[in-house]
């Protein structure tokens, strides 16, 4: 539902906890906006929290965003209900809502897991805004790692953030060298990594992800 042309742009999945810190909200909007301004399609799942910051950051700069849903595309089925207005804004501003499910299908747990993996499948890179060591975000993280696409985790400096349970996943991924640390000064470097990875992906292999 919406503008299919956004799929012509390289996708970047923006994911994370439903309970980001204050700086996590700011970071999600900032990085999504910066990538959107550089021509990327910001892909997320319309969830409360980090997903919302991804969509909002892209929309705020007039950029492209796609929401993968775990429910039907009709307004009555939108989940969560708190983001119904955001879903409508995405369509009005020429973004896109995508779903595997028929009209009238409500959200189920399996649908949420599948949605998380599909976000990574549609994208050429994944940005983790904030995540704990365990949680739903890891479905998309693992899908990104398995498909050998670039994974970025936002780096935080304040004690308030680095001591927060919802940031420990970011710290662990960078420490284990599974993700690049994403800083506000490193967006262009991140774009270079993404472009290089995109060029190395065989088109036939990429099609098999959908």
Give the residues covered by each predicted segment:
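Glycine-biased, small-residue-rich flexible motifs in mid-sequence functional cores and linkers
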Residues: 1-210
């Amino acid at each position: 539902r919406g503008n299919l042309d956004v799929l012509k742009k390289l996708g970047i999945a923006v994911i994370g906890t439903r309970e980001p810190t204050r700086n996590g909200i700011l970071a999600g909007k900032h990085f999504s906006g910066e990538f959107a301004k550089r021509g990327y399609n910001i892909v997320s799942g319309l969830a409360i929290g980090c997903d919302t910051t991804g969509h909002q950051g892209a929309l705020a700069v007039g950029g492209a965003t796609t929401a993968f849903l775990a429910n039907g595309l009709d307004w009555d089925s939108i989940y969560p209900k708190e983001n119904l207005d955001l879903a409508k804004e995405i369509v009005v501003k020429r973004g896109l809502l995508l779903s595997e499910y028929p009209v009238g299908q409500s959200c189920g747990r399996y649908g949420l897991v599948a949605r998380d993996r599909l976000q990574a499948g549609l994208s050429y890179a994944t940005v983790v805004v904030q995540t704990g060591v365990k949680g739903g975000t890891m479905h998309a993280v693992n899908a990104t790692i398995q498909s050998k696409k670039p994974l970025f985790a936002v780096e935080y400096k304040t004690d308030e953030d680095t001591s927060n349970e919802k940031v420990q996943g970011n710290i662990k991924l960078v420490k284990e060298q599974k993700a690049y640390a994403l800083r506000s000064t490193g967006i262009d470097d991140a774009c270079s990594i993404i472009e290089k990875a995109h060029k190395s992906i065989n088109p036939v292999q990429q099609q098999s992800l959908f």
